[in-house]
Amino acid sequence: MVKKTKSNSLKKVATLALANLLLVGALTDNSAKAESKKDDTDLKLVSHNVYMLSTVLYPNWGQYKRADLIGQSSYIKNNDVVIFNEAFDNGASDKLLSNVKKEYPYQTPVLGRSQSGWDKTEGSYSSTVAEDGGVAIVSKYPIKEKIQHVFKSGCGFDNDSNKGFVYTKIEKNGKNVHVIGTHTQSEDSRCGAGHDRKIRAEQMKEISDFVKKKNIPKDETVYIGGDLNVNKGTPEFKDMLKNLNVNDVLYAGHNSTWDPQSNSIAKYNYPNGKPEHLDYIFTDKDHKQPKQLVNEVVTEKPKPWDVYAFPYYYVYNDFSDHYPIKAYSK
């Protein structure tokens, strides 16, 4: 039997004290990690060109039905912010925004539809053009500022619309993060050879100039996303990164966002078309960077659905002619 001594008692007290210190340290470290996570302003975003053209002109694309299908989809859930493009049809886009309102209660109006609901309207807004800009942003977190900016110029169909970009300042965990959603000049035979590319470059510089003039603090992140109508891997892609002043990202999922080979709606329009990667979410170079940003193309499909437009029934199994992309930090 070992006799208890003063020395042994002191050692026991010292051991207990050390254990308590280690426990306090571990709790403090875990608390700091939790606080760091709490203050994190990295966002989980989605951008989707939902192909909601006017139902009067294009009655065979099931815009209202797809508004419901998108609202029920898996990809639309559990994000922080969603950017919609081509939400042109008033009724169908209103239904879509209503369908996602429970999860994303903070929403902008659709770009260029009116001047109501915005903190500011900039650029070449017109109340007489045939079409609005089709872009809307919805958020899980409060939107503290909403600005719509209509591009100075466009060509072809885009020249008779209010296409531009939507700026939002979003508050997450008491800190600001900024999201810009856009849909730049589309390829259009009425534009003339190469003119659409020239206009896209000008529009991207408008976005970059807006960010610079906004004087956003450098320690806040600025996301820029949407259907940019630039195919990844082309010479124009490098120009896009420069004109937007953004960093490239990691890519995952399907290798294109518009793919007539695998997408039933795109295939109907362009049965011999080649796949293109046109949709992106980037971050402005001059502001806080998230952890490595990933753009993942999601090819989720609904069950086959049909729509009747005299004298035919049409059957598809996609949400849109574009696939959505998810952006998240790795």
Curated annotation (Swiss-Prot):
EC number assigned by the record: 3.1.4.3
InterPro entries linked to this entry: Endo/exonu/phosph_ase_sf, Endo/exonuclease/phosphatase, Sph/SMPD2-like, Sphingomyelinase/PLipase_C
A single GO BP: killing of cells of another organism
GO MF terms held by the record: phosphatidylcholine phospholipase C activity; sphingomyelin phosphodiesterase activity; toxin activity
GO cellular component terms given for this protein: extracellular region
Catalysis: reaction(s): a 1,2-diacyl-sn-glycero-3-phosphocholine + H2O = phosphocholine + a 1,2-diacyl-sn-glycerol + H(+)
Keyword terms: Cytolysis, Disulfide bond, Hemolysis, Hydrolase, Signal, Toxin, Virulence
Membrane-spanning intervals of the chain: none
Top EC class of this enzyme: hydrolase
Disulfide linkage: 155-191
Homology family: Belongs to the neutral sphingomyelinase family.
NCBIfam families, per database record: sphingomy
Subunit (UniProt): Monomer.
Protein name: Phospholipase C
Species assigned in the record: Staphylococcus aureus
Gene that encodes the chain: hlb
